[in-house]
């Protein structure tokens, strides 16, 4: 009897945790969708030139170990 009660409480607790997590992640999906549309709307020429720092605007070529766009040791 005690084991049955413990199992029922555990199942209810895990179900409540999953429902709470689903509520929290629902808002993040909206932001992810917005982020993906802004990436798609970016023009292919919207990139940093060689020698610029790798950061918010992606490098046209690649980012090297020193954190700069262009040739050299790549990450």
From Swiss-Prot:
The keyword ATP-binding does not apply. GO terms for molecular function: ion channel inhibitor activity; toxin activity. Disulfide bonds join 47-60, 54-63, 59-69. One of its GO terms (cellular component) is extracellular region. Residues 1-22 form the signal peptide. It comes from the Eukaryota. InterPro entries: Conotoxin. It is found in: Secreted. Residues 23-42, 70-75 form a propeptide. Expressed by the venom duct. Coiled coil: none annotated. Keywords: Amidation, Disulfide bond, Knottin, Neurotoxin, Secreted, Signal, Toxin. The modification Cysteine amide is found at residue 69. The keyword Transcription does not apply. The presence of a 'disulfide through disulfide knot' structurally defines this protein as a knottin. The cysteine framework is VI/VII (C-C-CC-C-C). Belongs to the conotoxin O1 superfamily. This is Conotoxin Leo-O3. It comes from Conus leopardus.
